[in-house]
Amino acid sequence: MHSPPRDQAAIMLWKLVENVKYEDIYEDRHDGVPSHSSRLSQLGSVSQGPYSSAPPLSHTPSSDFQPPYFPPPYQPLPYHQSQDPYSHVNDPYSLNPLHQPQQHPWGQRQRQEVGSEAGSLLPQPRAALPQLSGLDPRRDYHSVRRPDVLLHSAHHGLDAGMGDSLSLHGLGHPGMEDVQSVEDANNSGMNLLDQSVIKKVPVPPKSVTSLMMNKDGFLGGMSVNTGEVFCSVPGRLSLLSSTSKYKVTVGEVQRRLSPPECLNASLLGGVLRRAKSKNGGRSLRERLEKIGLNLPAGRRKAANVTLLTSLVEGEAVHLARDFGYICETEFPAKAVSEYLNRQHTDPSDLHSRKNMLLATKQLCKEFTDLLAQDRTPIGNSRPSPILEPGIQSCLTHFSLITHGFGAPAICAALTALQNYLTEALKGMDKMFLNNTTTNRHTSGEGPGSKTGDKEEKHRK
C-alpha cells in the first residue's frame, strides 16, 4: 500500500542529491552565495541502509585547481596558485591564517574533506582568493618566522578591528624585510655592514675600543699594567730548528682590541696561537676581564685581515729588522747605479742628472728622518712622542695596522735607495773626471800649447 509514496520519496531524495552535487560543483567555479543550508538536514537520511546504492556524497577536489571564474565582461586577474589549492592550511608560517578572517571556515572545510563526510558539501567562502591574487610571488614570506603571531591569532580569533589592522596592505612591514636583510648581511664577508656595526653597536662603558691609554697606563679608570706579560706565542715564520717565542704584553693585547683593528675573540685567539675549543672564546674573554680588558661577545672586526694580522709585534719587528739587514748588505746598489749611469753618458746631461740625484737623496733623507721619529708604542716600550699629535696619530694608525712592521720596513727600503743614490753620485763624479781629463788631453795636443813649443825647440 505504501510503495508509491516510498518510491516518490526515494526519487525526490535522489534528485536532491544530484542537485546538491552539481550545485556544489557550480559553486566551486563561481564565487556564489551559499544557498543549500536549508537542505543539510535532509542529507543525513541519504546515508541510511535502504538507500546504500546512492553515489558517495563526498566531493573530492581535482588535482588541477581551476582559477576562480569571473563572468564577462570581467577578465580574470593574474593569478599564481600552487598545485594543491589547500596546501596553505597545514603550513603554520603561511600568511593566509593571518590575513584571512575566514580562517575557521577554511579549517572546518579541511576537516570535513579529510573525513569524507556528507557535510563536506557545505560551500565555503572564496572571498579571500581575489585578494591573494595580488600578492607578489617573488616575495619569500616563509623566511620570516613569526609563529607567535601567525598561530596564536587563530586560536584566539580575530575580531573586526584586528582583521582590519592585519589586512593585506601590511604585507610590506619593514620588520619582515629588515630581519632578512640582517641575516643576509651577517653571512657575508667583509662589507659595508661590518664597518657600520662597529660604529652603531652600543659599546659597554668599560670597552677597550672606546677608551684610550693615557701616560700612566690607566685604561678607563682601571689600573692596567701594560708592560705585564700576557702570554708567550711561538713564531709563525721561523724554521723548526730555530723556533723562537715572543712575549705578548697586556698593552699589545689592548692594541689588538682597539681601533683600527678591533679584533674579535676568534681572530685574537689566532694571533695568540690558542687552540680552538668549544668554549675558547668564553675562556679568553674571562681571562681578559681578569686583567681589566673587555672583549664584547659577537663583535665584528673593523679592518681587513692580512698576513701581518697573524703576527705578534715581536715577530713583526724581527721580520722588519731582518729585512733591513738584507737591504743594507745584499742589495746590489753599485751594480744598479753603474747600469743606469751607462744609459746617461751625454756630457751635456751629466750636470743636470747629478743635480737630480742630489735632490732625490735629500728628499729621501727627509722622509727617512720623519719615519725615524715615529714613537708608536711597540711591545712593552712607551716612548714619549716627538712629532706633532696630528702626524703622530697617522703614523700610529699605520703602525697598528702592520703590527710595527710598516715604518721599519719602509726605512729599510729607503736605505737601499739611499745606497743606490750614493753609488750613482760616485759614478757621476768619475764621469766628470774622465770628461775633464779628455778635454785636457785634447787641448794639449793643439798648436800654441806648451808641449808644442818644447817640441819645436827640440827640433831646432
Curated annotation (Swiss-Prot):
Residues 451-460 have a biased composition (Basic and acidic residues). There is a cross-link at K21 (Glycyl lysine isopeptide (Lys-Gly) (interchain with G-Cter in SUMO)). It is found in: Nucleus. One of its GO terms (biological process) is nervous system development. GO terms for cellular component: chromatin; nucleoplasm; nucleus. Sumoylated on Lys-21; which inhibits transcriptional activity. Keywords: Activator, Disease variant, DNA-binding, Isopeptide bond, Nucleus, Phosphoprotein, Transcription, Transcription regulation, Ubl conjugation. InterPro entries: TF_AP2, TF_AP2_beta, TF_AP2_C. It holds the Pfam family TF_AP-2. GO terms for molecular function: chromatin binding; cis-regulatory region sequence-specific DNA binding; DNA binding; DNA-binding transcription activator activity, RNA polymerase II-specific; DNA-binding transcription factor activity; DNA-binding transcription factor activity, RNA polymerase II-specific; protein heterodimerization activity; protein homodimerization activity. Residues 121-132 have a biased composition (Low complexity). Its main location: nucleus. Residues 35-51 have a biased composition (Polar residues). Belongs to the AP-2 family. It is linked to Char syndrome: An autosomal dominant disorder characterized by patent ductus arteriosus (PDA), facial dysmorphism and hand anomalies. Patent ductus arteriosus 2: A congenital heart defect characterized by the persistent opening of fetal ductus arteriosus that fails to close after birth. Fetal ductus arteriosus connects the pulmonary artery to the descending aorta, allowing unoxygenated blood to bypass the lung and flow to the placenta. Normally, the ductus occludes shortly after birth. Binds DNA as a dimer. Can form homodimers or heterodimers with other AP-2 family members. Interacts with CITED4. Interacts with UBE2I. Interacts with KCTD1; this interaction represses transcription activation. Interacts with CITED2 (via C-terminus); the interaction stimulates TFAP2B-transcriptional activity. Sequence-specific DNA-binding protein that interacts with inducible viral and cellular enhancer elements to regulate transcription of selected genes. AP-2 factors bind to the consensus sequence 5'-GCCNNNGGC-3' and activate genes involved in a large spectrum of important biological functions including proper eye, face, body wall, limb and neural tube development. They also suppress a number of genes including MCAM/MUC18, C/EBP alpha and MYC. AP-2-beta appears to be required for normal face and limb development and for proper terminal differentiation and function of renal tubular epithelia. PANTHER family: TRANSCRIPTION FACTOR AP-2, TRANSCRIPTION FACTOR AP-2-BETA. This is Transcription factor AP-2-beta. It comes from Homo sapiens.
